[in-house]
């Protein structure tokens, strides 16, 4: 490797993905450094309000015997910190070091941080798909006075108790919106309205998210080699029956579920129990003025607060390469990666987790991918430049990576090993670290 670099690998982001990649870089004998812009590890979880939690079961979030005491924000932060403590990673993490510019100079990556420049031969951008809260553009008068209508993104609602007695308008059709509906109902909002353009599939259930969010049944379908079309048909039939049983036919998504494209979200029990009380509007928010919200249908509403459950975007503007800087969504980013992780727009650049869609084990997924990225850097694996054009869930990822990384996926630890693990592991037990 070039003598002009300081490190074999730099990793932008000290969240779960970044720390796992640091661990596997060290296991591979690479000199690696994590650059984290915040004052501590944890990524986005460090900034989220305490009520935020995961929407998969605990066993699918963590891996090995790394501790996870619960699904909430504080417990998730503690689990992420446990990677630092268990594997003595702290000396490889540079905090308060946001990257303002990333440029490949033809020989290595140069990363500008507040106190200088870090150079590395390879770069992992472990910034996730939740870099920046997304709020759609709406019309506002140029000379608008202060609006009576308060606006909060889901990440900015610090205390849901403040919703008590308020007229609430929730905007969005995915997991963040479902959470906001649930919180509004739980904390006594006077009236709850819901605006959505399109709806994502979710699993109607009375079970908590951390129970309903288990992906193990789906993994077993893969392990039994059930064809994708049949998997989709089985899941679609089950979901439609659940929607009918809960009286939710009015919000059936317009398309049949396709696990190559869709994320499967667990339902929120309180939202389902009070579904009839939620005033629903299909459309978008077009304008917000001094005291009202106008929808694309022409309806004019007067809520006290608008809660934006519109998710997050990807912020890559620190990249010097214009094609990268222009990417703003996880879907765009995934389409610009070959072999799941490898950037098509820059040399020696990797984006972990772009195919992770909530139907898989989070830490395990990152660990499997990190191991192969390190093998590629060391020259024992080959990440090709062919985009996948679909989500790769769990065992699909093993099928894709195994022939490209024979050193990690040996005859003893290849497809059959992970198939047997999927079928044999107790549902409440995390998968072992690879």
Task: Describe every region a protein language model picked out.
Residues 2-44, 68-200, 206, 219-383, ...:
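Flavin (primarily FAD) cofactor-binding/catalytic cores of flavoenzymes
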Residues 382-392:
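Polar, surface-exposed loop/tail segments
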């Amino acid at each position: 490797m070039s003598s002009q670099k300081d490190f074999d690998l730099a990793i932008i982001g000290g969240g779960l993905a970044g720390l796992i990649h640091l661990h596997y870089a060290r296991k591979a004998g690479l000199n690696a450094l994590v650059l984290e812009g915040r004052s501590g590890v944890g990524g986005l979880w460090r900034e989220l309000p305490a009520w935020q939690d995961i929407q998969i079961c605990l066993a699918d979030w963590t891996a090995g015997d790394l501790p996870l005491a619960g699904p909430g924000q504080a417990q998730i932060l503690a689990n992420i910190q446990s990677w630092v403590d268990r594997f003595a990673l702290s000396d490889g993490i540079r905090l308060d070091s946001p990257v303002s510019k990333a440029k490949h100079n033809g020989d290595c990556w140069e990363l500008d941080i507040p106190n200088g420049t870090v150079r590395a031969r390879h770069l992992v951008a472990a910034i996730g798909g939740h870099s920046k809260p997304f709020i759609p553009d709406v019309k506002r008068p140029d000379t608008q006075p202060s609006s009576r209508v308060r606006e909060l993104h889901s990440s900015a609602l610090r205390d849901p108790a403040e919703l008590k007695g308020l007229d609430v308008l929730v905007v969005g059709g995915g997991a963040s919106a479902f959470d906001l509906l649930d919180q509004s109902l739980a904390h006594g909002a006077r009236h709850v309205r819901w605006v959505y353009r399109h709806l994502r599939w979710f699993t109607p259930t009375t079970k908590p998210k951390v129970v309903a969010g288990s992906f193990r049944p789906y993994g077993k379908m893969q392990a039994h080699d059930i064809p994708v079309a049949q998997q989709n048909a089985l899941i679609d039939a089950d979901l439609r029956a659940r929607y009918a049983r809960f009286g939710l036919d009015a919000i059936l998504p317009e398309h049949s579920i396709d696990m190559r494209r869709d994320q499967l979200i667990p339902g929120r029990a309180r939202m389902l129990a009070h579904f009839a009380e939620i005033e629903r509007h299909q459309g978008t928010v077009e304008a917000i003025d001094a005291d009202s919200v106008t929808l694309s249908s022409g309806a004019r509403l007067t809520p006290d607060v608008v809660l934006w459950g519109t998710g997050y975007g990807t912020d890559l503007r620190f990249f010097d390469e214009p094609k990268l800087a222009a990417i703003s969504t996880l879907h765009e980013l995934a389409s610009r990666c070959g072999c799941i992780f490898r950037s098509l727009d820059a040399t020696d650049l990797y984006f972990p987790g772009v195919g992770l869609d909530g139907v898989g084990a989070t830490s395990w997924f990152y660990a499997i991918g990190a191991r192969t990225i390190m093998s590629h850097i060391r020259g024992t694996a080959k990440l090709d430049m062919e985009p996948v054009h679909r989500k790769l869930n769990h065992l699909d990822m093993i099928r894709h990576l195994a022939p490209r990384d024979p050193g990690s996926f040996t005859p003893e630890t290849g497809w059959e090993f992970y198939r047997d693990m999927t079928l044999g592991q107790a549902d409440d037990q995390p998968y072992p670290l690879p």
